[in-house]
Amino acid sequence: MNTDDVLAVFREAGAILEGHFILTSGLRSPVFLQKARVFMHADKTEKLCKALAEKIRAADLGPIDYVVGPAIGGLIPSYETSRHLGVPSVWVERENGVFRLRRFDVPKGARVVIVEDIVTTGLSIRETIDCMKDLGIEVVAAACIVDRSAGKADVGTRLISLAEYEVPAYPADKLPPELAAIPAVKPGSRNI
């Protein structure tokens, strides 16, 4: 599965939106990938996550003990990808603004892959890595359905992406006039 195939799945689901969006990262963009419209369809989710699992396997990372997903956006893709890898899925969630592994016991030294939905700046993955390091858990790689940065985001580890789709993103004070003229909406989940 390549970038065009992934974007075709997003288009079929009506998940590529155009307008003025405030991304989870705080950056502004004329395009928003509304992955919830994809993930509401089990067949589309399975197709994408099975392909991501195959790409993770092909990366020859050695044994993987767990897949870790940052809540909220990483929950569905991490679970479905773990199913195809045949390993347990756990997740981190925010507690006082910091990712914590609250509901699971993952042993020190466990080897994990972090699976995220969409990467723009890599912040959620970096924060998940910090949480894992604090627990003595080894992050062998991160993976995502779509890398909006096209490989430019520093996620703090190797990033395996099913699709690279570079979409412009701007700080709020550096918007092009055509984007500034459109009212902004914030569809992300960072502060939920």
From Swiss-Prot:
Alphabetized CDD domains for the sequence: PRTases_typeI
GO MF terms held by the record: magnesium ion binding; orotate phosphoribosyltransferase activity
Pathway: Pyrimidine metabolism; UMP biosynthesis via de novo pathway; UMP from orotate: step 1/2
Residue numbers binding 5-phospho-alpha-D-ribose 1-diphosphate: E116, D117, I118, V119, T120, T121, G122, L123, S124
Pfam families named in the record: Pribosyltran
InterPro entries: OPRT, Orotate_PRibTrfase_bac, PRibTrfase_dom, PRTase-like
Reaction(s) the record says it catalyses: orotidine 5'-phosphate + diphosphate = orotate + 5-phospho-alpha-D-ribose 1-diphosphate
Protein name in the entry: Orotate phosphoribosyltransferase
